[in-house]
């Protein structure tokens, strides 16, 4: 798990499991975005039943044809609301390298007014 910008972390699924609760608390994580495919729902799912952590679970196919852009407004709103409450957000997928990283990058581009050029 790495802090990409202040308060926004990116990591693999393993960083959001029950045995990581102390680490999540030490980093001040209050919100988690769980990114998975429908077929991963059996094993990529919220693991922490702690009322201090708010989850957003997104079913996003890990394919070249998935329209991930349609999820950006929901992700942005969730992260913005967490920040307004002085929270910190972990975004994770299975490995934390494609779908979840894309969502984090899109948030940063929107927040700082960056283009793809």
Range-by-range predicted roles:
Residues 1-91, 103, 109-117:
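Cysteine-based protein phosphatase catalytic domain of the PTP/DSP
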Residues 94:
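P-loop (Walker A) phosphate-binding loop of NTP-binding proteins
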């Amino acid at each position: 798990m790495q802090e990409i910008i202040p308060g926004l972390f990116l990591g693999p699924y393993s960083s959001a499991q029950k045995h990581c609760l102390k680490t999540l608390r030490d980093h001040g994580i209050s919100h988690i975005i769980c990114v998975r495919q429908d077929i991963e729902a059996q094993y990529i799912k919220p693991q922490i039943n702690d009322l201090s952590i708010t989850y957003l679970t997104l079913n996003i196919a890990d394919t070249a044809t998935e329209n991930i852009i349609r999820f950006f407004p929901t992700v942005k709103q969730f992260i913005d609301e967490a920040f307004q409450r002085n929270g910190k957000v972990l975004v994770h997928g299975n490995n934390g390298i494609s779908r979840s990283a894309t969502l984090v990058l899109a948030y940063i581009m929107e927040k700082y007014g960056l283009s793809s050029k």
